[in-house]
Amino acid sequence: LYGLSGAVVGAVDLVRGIGRLAGLDVIDVPGATGDLDTDYGAKARAAVAALDDHDLVWVHVEAPDEAAHMGDLRAKVRAIERVDAEVLAPILSAPQRPAAMVLPDHHTPLSTRTHADPPVPFVISEPLPGSGGGGAMTFGEADAAATGLLVASGAELMRLFLEATG
């Protein structure tokens, strides 16, 4: 995949299958459930360990999506907070000093409790080339839309990520 060795950490069969088809190693993580009760820390530890022998690790956490399907705002906020504190923070502070890109795989508005197709916000831990680092200061749909940056495809997003992170 893009000339990189990669792995996927996640419990959802669809995600694991996509990873396998993309040539990624699928990492089994005890306690990873694909639901609100997933072991966030175990996913982070597995990702950090995988960085020792992979260039790229895709970590998928289903909990915010599941909370949205339930229409539970508090659970969705809590799941996002846990991703930030228990998954992203440990990965970014790992000895390998990895770059990161964070994004949802799709919208799931609480109001409809179902998937929607607007563009999703994303954040990359390094500034995009030529951007001057002038992206959104917070992470959300409205802030992302205000930047005027619209990425047409996953391949284009990956190209931007690889350019930004060297």
What residue spans do the PLM features occupy?
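Feature captures the catalytic ectodomains and active-site-proximal regions of enzymes
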Residues: 1-166
